[in-house]
Design a protein with these regions (language model features):
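Non-catalytic, conformational "gating/processing" segments within enzyme and secreted inhibitor domains
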Residues: 33, 72-243, 248, 259-355
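Feature captures eukaryotic membrane-trafficking machinery centered on endolysosomal pathways
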Residues: 37-55, 59, 225, 354-386
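Extracellular/luminal recognition modules and glycoprotein regions
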Residues: 17-28
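Post-signal peptide N-terminal segment of secreted/secretory-pathway proteins
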Residues: 26-37, 41-95
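N-terminal low-complexity, Pro/Thr/Ser-rich intrinsically disordered segments
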Residues: 1-15
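Short glycine-rich loop/turn motifs
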Residues: 20, 220-223, 325, 361-365
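Acidic-glycine-rich active-site phosphate/pyrophosphate-binding loop
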Residues: 13-19, 143
Length: 386
């Protein structure tokens, strides 16, 4: 197995965040206005496995869209190094990143590609009969995703997503469960007003209370970072100063801005924190349109070149769609989050005194980050915690 250059692994972490927030903006342009969550880590890992088999103009387009600094052969070990770091056993929290290839039994794949995805991503190739048992294959893949995410993601691939033309499904599943370094006192949780959707009318939601955290301010926002036990991962919450200010903050949202916010926070023992409990569970998002708009339309077309996957003489391949689904729950003890991404490939047819208050009583953003690499594992928007 080719070892990863540490600089390439760091670059892949940066690319993960940049690409994920591109997808975020594309979903916002689609008209997704309610609660929303995505996993940049899951999306980038699944598409990095796909990019490993891309060649020619398709590889160039995917490299640009995914913000990758390296060619397919160098990206596979770089992404794999990050996946292995996330999967390293820990006593303080659970972070599991699982990958698998589900391949059509009759199709001839390139041995070198299957070996690379196995060695770098831990993605074993399982043969299924898409041609005559498409629906049973879909159910089997969904069961695998469910088991990898502790049953939080039950139906990644919707009905009709697998058909007799399907040749390969590349799946990534991410599961996280962590406890706050300083837990909220459940006895202090009380129903308080939350101005859902930034409007004038409020709804009563269970709101957690704490004192202390990593706090900062930037133009138009307050920032709170809550570390998880082990202090390797943290949730950063970005609260617009204006009750209806979320849209303006999202207009300028990109990876550079997130890093800027992260650099603003410092430890404060006096900040008064009020944060609603929340749970977000997205439906299965089909992302083909968004990814085409971001610059990789060729990968979905009859001009796609995924010949790095297929054996010589095998029928040409193209991506048919990319499916993504996320679950995030935040409470007094900590956070549970899960995400899954499936790529379906088919044959072509600093504050002043007094002590600051961080009262999240209106819509806000959150980012679950790997504070070592800076990679965004999960990103979300809460407009109504109910």
């Amino acid at each position: 197995m080719t070892p990863a250059d540490p600089a390439d692994a760091r670059a892949f972490a940066t690319a993960t965040s940049a690409f994920g927030l591109d997808v975020w903006r594309a979903l916002r342009a689609r008209g997704e206005t309610g609660n929303l969550a995505i996993s940049p880590a899951s999306l980038s890992t699944a598409l990095a496995m796909t990019y490993g088999g891309a060649r020619g103009e398709t590889a160039t387009a995917m490299q640009r869209t995914l913000h990758l600094a390296t060619d397919p052969d160098a990206t596979m070990p770089a992404a794999g190094a990050l996946v292995r770091a996330w999967n390293a056993p820990r006593e303080t929290y659970t972070l599991a990143v699982a990958n698998r290839l589900f391949a059509e039994d009759s199709y001839a794949f390139r041995d070198a590609y299957l070996a690379a995805t196995r060695d770098h991503f831990g993605a074993e190739a399982e043969r299924l009969d898409f041609v005559s048992a498409a629906e049973a294959s879909r159910a089997h893949i969904n069961e695998w995703v469910s088991s990898q995410t502790r049953e939080r993601i039950r139906e990644l691939l919707p009905s009709g997503s697998i058909d007799p033309l399907t040749r390969l499904v590349l799946v990534n599943a991410v599961y996280f469960h962590g406890r706050w370094q300083h837990e909220f006192d459940r006895a202090r949780t009380e129903d308080l007003p939350f101005f859902a959707n930034g409007g004038e009318a409020s709804v009563a939601v269970p709101t957690m209370h704490a004192r202390g955290g990593r706090y900062g301010e930037d133009e138009g926002v307050q920032i709170l970072e809550l570390p998880y036990t082990g202090d390797e991962l943290a949730m950063m919450i970005v609260l617009p100063r204006e009750r209806d200010g979320l849209a303006a903050v999202e207009e300028t949202l990109d990876a550079t801005r997130v890093e800027q916010w992260a650099g603003r926070v410092t430890e404060r023992h006096d900040v008064d924190v009020r944060l609603p409990r929340f749970r977000i569970e997205t439906g299965s998002l089909a992302l083909r349109t968004e990814l085409e708009g971001l610059g990789m339309a060729i990968a979905f077309s009859d001009r796609a070149d995924l010949s790095g996957m297929s054996a010589d003489g095998a029928q040409a391949l193209a991506i048919s769609d990319v499916y993504h689904r996320v679950f995030v729950e935040v409470n007094e003890e900590g956070t549970e989050a899960a995400a899954a991404t499936g790529v379906v490939v088919a044959v072509r047819s600093m504050p002043a005194n007094p002590p600051p208050s961080f009262h999240a009583d209106h819509p806000f953003l959150f980012f679950l980050r790997d504070t070592r690499s800076g990679a965004i594992l999960f990103a979300g928007r809460v407009v109504d915690p109910r």
